Amino acid sequence: MSRHHMRVRKVALLGANGLVAQRFQQRLSKHPWFELVAVYGSPRTVGMELTELQWHLPESRPDLPELVVRSLDSIISDVDDFEIVFSALPSDVAREVEKKLAAEGCYVFSNASTHTEWMLMSHW
């Protein structure tokens, strides 16, 4: 496959309403390589559409897909819906969820410092 014909990858976002999560939404909204297909959030945001959540960034809200925020409790059963996960979760929440997703074969990109010790280890 040439770089001009890359297939679009389905991605999930962990975090819905925080600044980092909204920055991810902004970056993913028009990205040519990614399609945002699922967003997972806190119990406070579960069941709400992304467009219902207060927008905190100074830039205007991007055109977002019509997605309803899902519960983190359902994420492992949803892993067939996406292959890449971007995480804006706080470290204490991210630790277990991200580890489980990686074990299920998802590529996980995290903003949390939770797995820093793993990144510092030799993997050769």
Predicted regions and their residues:
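N-terminal Rossmann-like NAD(P) cofactor-binding subdomain of oxidoreductases
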Residues: S2-W124
